[in-house]
């Protein structure tokens, strides 16, 4: 059990260019850029899970094996099954309908049905995914934010879904599903993401 004073905020703007939907041949279309980015190789923002504003806030975070408790901006002490398309979904709030966070199932479909390649675009390392349609998207390795520190930028990619973690029963109330990849080629969807970490976000739509 631990008690922390965490400053929760996005380091980059929540505003984003008009998203272009890329049809990879999957169940949803994926945006060509991260939330907060202007180009595919831009990192965009690093956002806390269930923060619909992306703005700065000081929150007393009581974080242990069975709950997640913070101010109401970050979901509070509630049993949330998922936030895709809800008022806690920053994509829906910033980009409008029909854009939203991907679900765990949609993120898993992305990494299992697409060809994956480690590449650099304009000096930015990341993951290129080629779908069954032959079209591609690029996920830059934006690292993650812990409190005020940005870690492993250019080395790892961390991308939120809107799905609450279920695999770890002891942590199910304060973990969420996310995509992780690194320079060694390791790629997985994990439900071990701490919600107060700042991760990248790639919007989706039907």
Where are the model-predicted features located?
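Bacterial Sec-dependent N-terminal signal peptides
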Residues: 1-19
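C-terminal, surface-exposed recognition/capping segments
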Residues: 22-206
């Amino acid at each position: 059990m631990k008690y922390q004073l965490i400053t929760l905020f996005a380091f980059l703007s929540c505003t984003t260019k008009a998203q272009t939907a890329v049809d990879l041949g999957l169940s949803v279309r994926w945006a060509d850029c991260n939330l907060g980015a202007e180009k595919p190789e831009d990192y965009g923002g690093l956002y806390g899970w269930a923060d619909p504003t992306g703005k700065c806030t000081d929150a007393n975070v009581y974080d242990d094996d069975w709950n997640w408790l913070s101010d109401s901006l970050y979901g509070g002490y509630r049993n949330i099954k998922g936030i895709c398309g809800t008022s806690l979904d920053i994509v829906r709030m910033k980009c409008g309908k029909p854009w939203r966070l991907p679900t765990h199932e949609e993120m898993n479909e992305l990494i299992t049905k697409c060809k994956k390649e480690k590449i650099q675009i304009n000096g930015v390392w990341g993951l290129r995914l080629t779908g069954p349609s032959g079209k591609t998207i690029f996920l830059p390795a934006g690292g993650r934010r812990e409190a005020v520190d940005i870690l492993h930028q250019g080395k790892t990619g961390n991308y939120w879904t809107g799905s609450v973690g279920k695999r770890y029963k002891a942590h199910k109330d304060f973990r969420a599903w996310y995509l992780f990849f690194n320079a060694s080629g390791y790629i997985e969807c994990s439900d071990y993401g701490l919600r107060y970490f700042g991760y990248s976000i790639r919007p989706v739509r039907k």
